[in-house]
Every structure is written in structure tokens, then in C-alpha cells.
């Protein structure tokens, strides 16, 4: 009789431990990469003013697919293809080919970043804005 009670007690304890441990699992939340954008003024060969944009992911390592840029009048510029390049957290990367730039327009520019997190391959699409002021 004592052996049966011992086995029942151990069985109940084991079952309770399994139920409690399965209920305590943390729910994983996928962190969406956050980007900041900066701009540098450039002068084109014809003397007109332009901008070169640079982005960086401030909270994750990423594999970038493309960046779609919208100028202040909400015109979509052809997407900048990042060719699946990997960037580590806080690594700055150009949002145009090295010898090109964008016509300078005052106002708020919008940047839609698309790619994958390198840690788990989860795809993302997130936006950042930059306000361009001055002459």
C-alpha cells in the first residue's frame, strides 16, 4: 500500500511540474528592426544641390533587401536594391550608389526598409523619416 501511495504522489508531483513548467514559457516577441537615417549635402556636376542618404539599424543585425524612398511630395523614387547585403547593428550604409545622390527637396523624406533579421531570418518591413531643412 505504501508503494502505491509513493508512486501516486510521485506521479502527481511529476504531472504538476510538467503543467507548471509548460505554463511558464515566455512568449517570444519578434523585435522589428529600427532604423535611423542621416543626409549629407552634395553638389552635382551641373552645380545643383543634392543629398546622399545613409541608414543604420540601431537594434539588430540585418540582411537588407531594398529601401524604397519617398521624397517630400510623396513621389516614390525607384527602390535602392541592397542585394541581400548583411549589416551589423549600428553599421552605417549608403542608400544610393556611391557616385549618385538625390535632388535636394526640403521637407520630410520617408524610407521603407525591407529585409530579414540575421538572427532568425524573419522578414521585416519598417519605415523611418528624415526632415530636410535649410536652403
Regions found by a protein language model. Give the residues of each.
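Bacterial N-terminal signal peptides that target proteins for export
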Residues: 1-11
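Bacterial Sec-dependent N-terminal signal peptides
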Residues: 3-5, 16-43
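Generic signature of intrinsically disordered, low-complexity, basic-rich segments
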Residues: 12-13, 111
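First exposed extracellular module after export/assembly in secreted or surface-exposed proteins
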Residues: 31-135
Amino acid at each position: 500500500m505504501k508503494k502505491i501511495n509513493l508512486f501516486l504522489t510521485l506521479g502527481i508531483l511529476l504531472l504538476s511540474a510538467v503543467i507548471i513548467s509548460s505554463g511558464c514559457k515566455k512568449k517570444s516577441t519578434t523585435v522589428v528592426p529600427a532604423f535611423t537615417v542621416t543626409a549629407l549635402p552634395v553638389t552635382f556636376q551641373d552645380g545643383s544641390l543634392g543629398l546622399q542618404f545613409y541608414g543604420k539599424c540601431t537594434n539588430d543585425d540585418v540582411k537588407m533587401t531594398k529601401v524604397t524612398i519617398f521624397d517630400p511630395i510623396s513621389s516614390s523614387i525607384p527602390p535602392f536594391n541592397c542585394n541581400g547585403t548583411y549589416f551589423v547593428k549600428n553599421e552605417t550604409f549608403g542608400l544610393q550608389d556611391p557616385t549618385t545622390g538625390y535632388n535636394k527637396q526640403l521637407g520630410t523624406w520617408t524610407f521603407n526598409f525591407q529585409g530579414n533579421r540575421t538572427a532568425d531570418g524573419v522578414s521585416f518591413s519598417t519605415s523611418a523619416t528624415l526632415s530636410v531643412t535649410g536652403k
